[in-house]
Amino acid sequence: MGINFDVSRPKARSSINMTTKFHTIGLIGKPHHLGTNQTLKRLHHWLTMQGYEVLAEERVSTELGTNIEAVDLLEIGARCDLAIVVGGDGNMLGAARVLARFDLGVIGVNRGNLGFLTDLPPDAFEEALARVLDGEFDTEHRFLLEAEVYRHGMLKASNTAVNEAVLHPGKIAHMIEFEVYIDDQFMYSQRADGMIVSTPTGSTAYALSAGGAILTPNLQALILVPMFPHTLSCRPIVVDACSTIKMVVSPENGENLEVSCDGHVHLAVLPGDEIIIRRSSERLRLIHPKGHNYFHVLRTKLGWGSKLF
């Protein structure tokens, strides 16, 4: 099967109608973090002064005072027109796995390190955010992964991932054995420290550190990156996003394993289990300030060289 480079299915980015308006906005952030709390307080004050109804995720609401409605992520997804996540990419990933099912627009204020998914600066967000709230923004859909663990043909655990699903041993630096199938066609057996199955969104995260290629967000593709394979010939491979990836763990593995979703959610895996990873029907709807440039983000975050002439 060839890789589908038709970026129009589904559409990766579109300009939103200038008449789009937001009314109820949810605030989400990293709990017990001084910088995040300061930004959340500024956001809450600024948004309420603009006349918006503001809800705060319950883990951060207690640090914002008493005059704010505290709700969980599910209620933010159900009631809000926009969610603002303050923190790093990890905070965005945690919120996105819940909010993607609501098709809620999400924008980030960077209080982390690299901040590939968080566009707004924490100390000067007002001007850019005001334009977004006036309808001047771009939207971009990022697909998620669905990871399932089967034991003796029965589904034992499942979850979703925005960046990657990783099969790995319970112990650090311990080799495991497994087979990999693409759409039920045997690809190879592996003796490695694990396998990273990444979306284009995750290709600048763990997969990049493991030697994988960067995939632009509009590609409908997945990248499989073996972790320290016990062979010189095994390299990352890119497959169509419609592919179903199956990994069968050897019964001879002498310990328990895990599938980690974005490094946050861990699914228990036993020797002999099968792991199925496929594209989820859920998509993250990212909101960017108008004119957002992905390659500018790469240059800035990864320290690439600027134009020579």
Curated annotation (Swiss-Prot):
Per the record, the major location class is cytoplasm
Q: Which GO terms describe its molecular function?
A: ATP binding; metal ion binding; NAD binding; NAD+ kinase activity
Gene3D superfamilies per record:
Probable inorganic polyphosphate/atp-NAD kinase, domain 1, Probable inorganic polyphosphate/atp-NAD kinase, domain 2
A single GO cellular-component term from the record reads: cytoplasm
Q: Pfam families from the entry?
A: NAD_kinase, NAD_kinase_C
What is its EC class?
A: transferase
The entry's NAD(+)-binding residues are D89, G90, N163, E164, H174, R191, D193, T204, A205, Y206, A207, L208, S209
Report the catalytic activity: NAD(+) + ATP = ADP + NADP(+) + H(+)
Required cofactor(s): a divalent metal cation
Cellular location(s)? Cytoplasm
Keyword annotations for this protein, in alphabetical order, are: ATP-binding, Cytoplasm, Kinase, NAD, NADP, Nucleotide-binding, Transferase
Q: Where is the active site?
A: D89
Give the Enzyme Commission number: 2.7.1.23
Instruction: List GO BP terms, alphabetically.
Output: NAD metabolic process; NADP biosynthetic process
Among InterPro entries, the record links this protein to: ATP-NAD_kinase_N, ATP-NAD_kinase_PpnK-typ_C, NAD/diacylglycerol_kinase_sf, NADK
Q: List the disulfide bonds.
A: none
Protein family (similarity comment)? Belongs to the NAD kinase family.
Record's HAMAP family? Answer: NAD_kinase
Role, per record: Involved in the regulation of the intracellular balance of NAD and NADP, and is a key enzyme in the biosynthesis of NADP. Catalyzes specifically the phosphorylation on 2'-hydroxyl of the adenosine moiety of NAD to yield NADP.
Q: What is this protein called?
A: NAD kinase
Source species: Shewanella sp. (strain W3-18-1)
Source taxonomy: Bacteria, Pseudomonadati, Pseudomonadota, Gammaproteobacteria, Alteromonadales
